[in-house]
């Protein structure tokens, strides 16, 4: 979101631009005159010289994950750029990022007060909130406990170990039938179109306890809202980095607020229904689990503060929005990689055939017996790096990193793409090779190497839905690979070039799939 300013620069009228220009120049001169003094023993942050008003926007360009990676080669793992009027510290390198987010976690646990963040979940988002004090931490802990409790809820029938497994398994089987139907009718399918609806249905089941028909208007409306959110964020909001623009007409920002209002209205309605029908002895979904953990509980021993209905709405909204975009993007990329590397697809199928068989559906407990599949997922996360940056961080106090002084309230970008493609960490990082995560005999995943892959952030702001997301990607993939063979249209090149956005997606395309019969191979 923070690196989307460039496409929007030309969208202002002449009068708006003149007002902004004069005001920003004055503010720029004032800020420059009050630059912080560097404490003795520390160095000033290196980085490219910014232009007035726009800063380093032109150098960052439309593919910031690449341009900032190149800058890190020149300036090191800690350097500063300027986006509009706001100084931004960019962190690269595995050790540097771990030092900041884990060892100095409290100092880098903030969120910058970006204008657009105030409108996500009406400012009550757990993920985007600038708050990181005791109450926020207690709420995060409570939300994490609720998710953990939900993930262990028993399924409705003995064949499923938990309700999470049941939701994913049933939806994956439905997706397979649908793709088979589409193939017979049209001869090809758009992978993202069908995957995103299936993932949305799983998340609706987990969050709201309800499953929709794939043509249901409410479900498709939610999917479209998520898509609109990504598009609007992708167009950028300069008001995040040039504050005076907050007071000027902004069609993109107006649309952004409208999308968030529509999302929150839907979730509020569902949460209200859950409160009205809540039964402590019958926890139906994540919303019930959150309500259960909030009922008559204090957030911590010293604060008589309970999580309000609005906070529950904010958490559910975060989980739905982030989960839908992240998981659907991961699975869509996975199918693309299966098509791009048919020999790996065949190895994955043989692994499933040998360790699970073809007479039953893969389950969560099979995961440890499928090391190649686990390595494949890790390599997709690493190679695609579809989440090139975390949500921006912010320093909570004056601090230092690698000998450089970083003032309080400095916006911080974490370049996950750089870490996932760092030649110091990975041999031939541009090559797609799941075997890099496997032991010599191919029977175990190297957990140390696996933990180096950056996808869900680190430290105190790490994604609380990570475990559920990883399980969902694993189960969907295991079932799809067991039942379907994916391949490309004859003569059609497969374009794996990512399109930069909130999450990086591949270009929309059409693929083919055939249902495997049990006698295959």
Swiss-Prot record:
One of its GO terms (biological process) is hormone biosynthetic process. Its EC number is 1.14.14.1. The keyword Metal-binding applies. SUPFAM superfamilies: Cytochrome P450. One of its GO terms (cellular component) is endoplasmic reticulum membrane. It is found in: Endoplasmic reticulum membrane; Microsome membrane. InterPro entries: Cyt_P450, Cyt_P450_CS, Cyt_P450_E_grp-I, Cyt_P450_E_grp-I_CYP1, Cyt_P450_sf. PANTHER family: CYTOCHROME P450 1A, STEROID 17-ALPHA-HYDROXYLASE/17,20 LYASE. This is Cytochrome P450 1A1. It comes from Chelon auratus. The gene is cyp1a1.
């Amino acid at each position: 979101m923070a690196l989307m300013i460039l496409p929007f620069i030309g969208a202002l009228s002449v009068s708006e631009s003149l007002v902004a220009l004069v005001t920003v120049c004055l503010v720029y001169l004032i800020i420059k005159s009050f630059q912080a003094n560097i404490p003795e023993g520390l160095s000033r942050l290196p980085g490219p010289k910014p232009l007035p008003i726009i800063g380093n926007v032109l150098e960052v360009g439309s593919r910031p994950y690449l341009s900032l990676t190149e800058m890190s080669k020149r300036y090191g793992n800690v350097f500063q750029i300027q986006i509009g009027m706001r100084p931004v510290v960019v962190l690269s390198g595995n050790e540097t990022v771990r030092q900041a987010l884990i060892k100095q976690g409290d100092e880098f646990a903030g969120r910058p007060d970006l204008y657009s963040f105030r409108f996500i979940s009406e400012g009550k988002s757990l993920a985007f909130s600038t708050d990181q004090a005791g109450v926020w931490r207690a709420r995060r802990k409570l939300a994490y406990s609720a998710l953990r409790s939900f993930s262990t809820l028993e399924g409705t029938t003995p064949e499923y170990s938990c309700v999470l497994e049941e939701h994913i398994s049933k939806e994956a089987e439905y997706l397979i039938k649908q793709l088979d139907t589409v193939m017979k009718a049209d001869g090809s399918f758009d992978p993202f179109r069908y995957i995103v609806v299936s993932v949305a249905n799983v998340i609706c089941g987990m969050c709201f306890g309800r499953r929709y028909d794939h043509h249901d208007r409410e479900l498709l409306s939610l999917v479209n809202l998520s898509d609109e959110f990504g598009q609007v964020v992708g167009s950028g909001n300069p008001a995040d980095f040039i504050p005076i623009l907050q007071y000027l007409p902004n069609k993109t920002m107006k649309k952004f607020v409208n999308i968030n209002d529509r999302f929150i209205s839907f979730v509020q309605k569902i949460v209200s229904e859950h409160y009205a029908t809540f039964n402590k002895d019958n926890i139906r979904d994540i919303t019930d689990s959150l309500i259960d953990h909030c009922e008559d509980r204090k957030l911590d021993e010293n604060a008589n503060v309970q999580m309000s209905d609005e906070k529950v709405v904010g958490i559910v909204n975060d989980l739905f929005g982030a989960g839908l975009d992240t998981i659907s993007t991961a699975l869509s990329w996975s199918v693309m990689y299966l098509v791009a590397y048919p020999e790996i697809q065949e190895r994955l199928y043989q692994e499933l055939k040998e360790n699970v068989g073809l007479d039953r559906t893969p389950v969560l407990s099979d995961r440890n017996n499928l090391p190649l599949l686990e390595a494949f997922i890790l390599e997709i996360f690493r190679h695609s790096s579809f989440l090139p940056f975390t949500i921006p961080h912010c320093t909570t106090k004056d601090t230092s990193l690698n000998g450089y002084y970083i003032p309080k309230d400095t916006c911080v970008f974490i370049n996950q793409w750089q870490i996932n493609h760092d030649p110091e960490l990975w041999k031939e990082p541009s090559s797609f090779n799941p075997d890099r995560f496997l032991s010599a005999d191919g029977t175990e995943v190297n957990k140390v190497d696996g933990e180096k892959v950056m996808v869900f952030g680190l430290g105190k702001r790490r994604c609380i839905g990570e475990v559920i997301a990883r399980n969902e990607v694993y189960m969907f993939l295991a079932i799809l690979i067991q039942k379907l063979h994916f391949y490309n249209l004859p003569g059609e090149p497969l374009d794996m070039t990512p399109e930069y956005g909130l999450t990086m997606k591949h270009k929309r395309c059409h693929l083919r799939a055939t249902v495997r019969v049990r006698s295959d191979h």
